[in-house]
């Protein structure tokens, strides 16, 4: 689940980078919905098994990618936004379809 964020790069435009990140996140959620749901349950329980990963590798990766977003903002390539919260919003949107598949199916009839 970290692979899509690792692919997020500064050497391409913000539009292309964010679009590609969203595409990759949607693919992971679509192709591995059970893993996404399991991760969601782990978070709801306070991350008893993954706290070290969250405060270690994940935090470092989010800090690294947030710096990329800040650089785009500083160079006028992206509207001002809190970089961490942008990443959180992308996570929320892309994982929603897997984590809440029952709700999505009930509402859309699909």
Give the positions of each predicted feature.
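Short helix-capping/turn signature of helix-turn-helix
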Residues: 41-46
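Amphipathic alpha-helical packing segments from all-alpha helical-bundle domains
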Residues: 1-2, 16, 27, 31, ...
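Hydrophobic/aromatic-rich alpha-helical bundle segments in the mid-to-C-terminal region
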Residues: 36-38, 51-52, 70-110
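Short, low-complexity, polar/charged sequence segments that are solvent-exposed and flexible
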Residues: 10-11, 57-60, 99, 108-109
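Hydrophobic alpha-helical connector segments
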Residues: 3-37, 83-90
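A ubiquitous short alpha-helical element
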Residues: 7-9, 23-25, 50-56, 110
């Amino acid at each position: 689940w970290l692979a899509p964020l690792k692919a997020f790069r500064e050497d391409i435009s913000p539009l292309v980078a964010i679009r590609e990140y969203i595409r990759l996140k949607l693919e992971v959620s679509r192709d591995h919905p059970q893993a996404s749901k399991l991760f969601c349950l782990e978070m709801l329980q306070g991350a008893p098994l993954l706290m070290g990963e969250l405060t270690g590798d994940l935090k470092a990766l989010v800090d690294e990618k947030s710096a990329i977003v800040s650089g785009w903002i500083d160079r006028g390539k992206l509207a001002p936004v809190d970089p961490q919260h942008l990443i959180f919003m992308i996570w929320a949107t892309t994982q929603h379809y897997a984590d809440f598949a029952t709700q999505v199916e009930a509402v859309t009839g699909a």
